[in-house]
Amino acid sequence: FARLEFKTWLRELQGDTPSPSAGERAGVRGEGADLQPPGAHRTGYETILDWTQLDAWLQKLDAAPLAAFDTETTSLDPMQARLVGLSFAVAPGEAAYLPLAHRYAGVPQQLTFDEALAKLKPWLESPRHAKLGQNLKYDMHVLANHGLRLEGVAHDTMLASYVVESDKSHDMDSMALRHLGIATIKYDEVTGKGAGRIGFDQVDIERAAEYAAEDADITLRLHGALSPRLAEEPRLEALYRDIEMPVM
């Protein structure tokens, strides 16, 4: 996102010396989000460990006008990453994690990897089911590693954030605090740091579910916060819709 041409164009659209009202539209309002009670937003999360649960969530995804989607993997390198699990959200606070490849002593029984992906394939590859994510290009690469093509990509909150407020941080933790007043679970909190860090496939499933479902939930909530901001600025909305999203 550090493209000089894009930054120059964005400054021209926003104006080099914005007035107070333009500055407000560029992101000042998000700084004042009231801090929410820790964990209060996570009460409706599920961990999908049986086929009945998965079928129920497939019905929710099929009916949702827009669903947030995220992957948990073995690597930050999308070309090397292998899928560990997927998370979904269909409404604020209504999210789930589907663990598929956690590996540690005493791990609960997980759904069969290939069979679960086969069930998800029609939704993942459906252009008529609108999906959003945070840095979806990464998730698209991960799915491609497993022979799946993500279709129906409608929105990306990281791209929207960059267009709306190019001078701010665009990681989910920062955005959640800035726009929603929510302190999220950090990756280091579930995997550890330094030499003691473990792979996500070694994270306890219930802890992983809390983290992963939150990712999808926060993505959906951020979309709700950022979309009106884009709508206020037709030129920025056009930049997001016509330039940024199509090149994903």
Question: Where in this protein do the model-derived segments appear?
Answer:
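Long, highly charged low-complexity segments
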Residues: 1-18, 30-86, 100-105, 109-123
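Aromatic-residue hotspot detector
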Residues: 6, 239-240
